[in-house]
C-alpha cells in the first residue's frame, strides 16, 4: 500500500528552472500531438511522443521527461473516456501551452544518502535536487509542483499493512452532513459532529463572494486586481487546509476507535451518483456539491486497511427509512426515528444499523425496542490523534527545506 507525504520547499531558482523546462517539454508534446491530428488526422501514441521529444532533454532526468509525456497522455485519455461516455460538456482536451509544469522523479532517479539527504537526479552533468529528509524510508516516487505560493513536494512511499484486526465485529457507517459519520457496531454507537465542517464551508463561500465582488470592481490585470486575487487564493487555501485537517482528524479518530473496539469489517454507505439529477434550490445544491463525503470515505478506507480492517461499500437506498425492528418504511421527521411498532432511535444511527444489516444479510438479528443514545465526537482545532512521537515527525515533515 502506498501513502503520500507532502513537504513545503519554498521557492528557489533551481526549482524554477526545472519547472520551466518541464513546462517547455509539455508545450512541445502538446503542440506536435495536435499538429499531427490537424494535418494528418493521426493521433500519436504515448510511446511515439516519448521517442520524438523525451530523449536528451537538457536539465531533466530521462524518466522525468517521460513523466511529462505520461501526464499529457493521461489527461488526454481521461478526456477521451469522458467524450465516449457523453459526459464531457464544457470539458476540453489538453491543448494549452504551459510555461511551468510539475517535475516528477521515478525510483531510479531517487536516492536516500546515508547522511539523511534525499538526492533527486536531473541527469548526467546537471546539479541534483538535495533535500533534508525527515525519514529513513526512501520514497518510490517524488513530484514537485507549485501550490500557488511556493513549491511543494509530494512523495509516495510503500507501507505494510502489518496490523491485524483485534476482532471480527462489523461496523456500519452512515455518512451525513450534520453528523459527518454515524457508526453502529451492534454493541456501541457514535456520531461525529459535522457542524464545524459546515461552518468552514459557509466561511469559504462568504470569503469567496466578498473578494469576488471587490475583484469585479477592479481593472483586469491591474496591481490592485492582482493583490485581491492573491488574497483570495491565500484565504481560500487556508480554509481548504482547515477542512482537510478536520477530515483527517475525524477519520483517524474513527478508525482508531473501531480498531480498539475489535472491529474487523467496516461497511460504508455508497453515495456514488447522489448529486446526479437533484435540484433542491441554489443553497441546498451548493451544500450538496461541497459535501466532502468522497474524500472522507477514501480516508476511512486507507486508514482502516492500515489497521488490517476490511472496508466494504453497500448501497444506501432506504436505509434511513426502514425500521431496524419491524422492517416497515417511512420517512422520519426531525433527528429522531419513531416507528409505530414502538421503536425509537437516532435517525443517522438507524441508517448505520441498516447499512450494517444490509451487508450481513436481511435475516440478521433485528434491533428491538429503543436504540441507545450514541456517544458524540466533536471536532476541536487542537485535537490530535497521534502520539507525541508521531506529532514530532509530522512537524519535521512540515519543516523541511532544500539543501543548499
Where are these regions (language model features)?
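Gly/serine-rich nucleotide phosphate-binding loop at the start of the catalytic core
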Residues: 1-67
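Positively charged, low-complexity nucleic-acid-binding target-recognition regions
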Residues: 13, 160, 285-287, 291-404
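Phosphate-interacting basic helix/loop segments used at nucleotide- and nucleic-acid interfaces
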Residues: 153-164, 237-259
Amino acid at each position: 500500500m502506498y501513502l503520500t507525504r507532502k513537504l513545503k520547499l519554498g521557492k528557489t531558482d533551481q526549482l524554477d528552472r526545472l519547472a520551466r523546462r518541464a513546462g517547455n517539454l509539455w508545450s512541445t508534446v502538446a503542440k506536435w500531438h495536435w499538429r499531427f491530428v490537424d494535418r494528418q488526422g493521426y493521433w500519436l501514441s504515448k510511446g511515439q511522443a516519448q521517442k520524438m521529444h523525451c530523449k536528451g532533454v537538457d536539465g531533466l532526468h530521462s524518466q522525468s521527461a517521460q513523466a511529462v509525456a505520461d501526464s499529457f497522455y493521461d489527461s488526454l485519455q481521461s478526456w477521451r473516456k469522458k467524450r465516449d461516455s457523453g459526459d464531457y460538456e464544457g470539458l476540453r482536451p489538453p491543448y494549452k501551452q504551459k510555461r511551468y509544469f510539475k517535475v516528477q522523479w521515478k525510483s531510479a532517479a531517487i536516492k536516500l544518502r546515508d547522511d539523511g539527504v534525499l538526492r533527486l537526479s536531473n541527469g548526467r552533468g546537471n546539479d541534483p535536487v538535495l533535500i533534508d529528509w525527515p525519514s529513513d524510508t526512501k520514497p518510490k516516487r517524488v513530484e514537485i509542483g507549485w501550490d500557488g505560493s511556493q513549491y511543494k513536494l509530494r512523495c509516495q512511499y510503500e507501507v505494510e499493512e502489518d496490523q491485524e484486526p483485534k476482532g471480527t465485529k462489523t461496523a456500519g457507517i452512515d455518512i451525513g452532513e450534520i453528523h459527518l459519520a454515524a457508526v453502529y457496531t451492534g454493541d456501541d454507537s457514535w456520531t461525529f459532529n459535522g457542524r464545524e465542517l459546515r461552518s468552514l464551508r459557509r466561511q469559504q463561500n462568504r470569503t469567496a463572494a466578498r473578494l469576488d465582488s471587490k475583484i469585479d470592481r477592479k481593472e483586469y490585470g491591474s496591481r490592485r486586481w492582482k493583490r485581491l486575487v492573491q488574497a483570495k487564493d491565500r484565504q481560500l487555501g487556508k480554509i481548504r487546509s482547515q477542512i482537510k485537517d478536520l477530515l483527517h482528524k475525524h477519520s483517524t479518530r474513527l478508525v482508531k476507535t473501531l480498531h480498539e473496539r475489535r472491529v474487523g469489517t467496516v461497511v460504508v454507505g455508497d453515495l456514488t451518483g447522489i448529486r446526479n439529477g437533484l435540484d433542491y434550490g441554489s443553497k441546498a445544491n451548493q451544500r450538496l456539491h461541497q459535501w466532502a463525503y468522497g474524500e472522507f470515505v477514501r480516508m476511512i478506507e486507507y486508514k482502516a486497511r492500515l489497521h488490517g480492517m476490511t472496508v466494504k461499500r453497500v448501497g444506501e437506498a432506504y436505509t434511513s427509512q426502514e425500521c431496524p425492528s419491524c422492517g416497515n418504511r417511512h420517512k422520519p421527521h426531525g433527528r429522531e426515528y419513531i416507528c409505530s411498532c414502538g421503536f425509537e432511535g437516532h435517525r443517522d444511527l438507524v441508517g448505520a444499523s441498516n447499512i450494517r444489516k444490509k451487508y450481513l444479510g436481511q435475516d440478521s438479528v433485528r434491533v428491538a425496542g429503543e436504540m441507545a443514545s450514541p456517544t458524540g465526537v466533536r471536532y476541536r482545532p487542537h485535537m490530535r490523534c497521534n502520539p507525541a512521537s508521531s506529532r514530532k515527525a509530522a512537524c519535521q515533515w512540515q519543516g523541511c527545506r532544500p539543501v543548499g
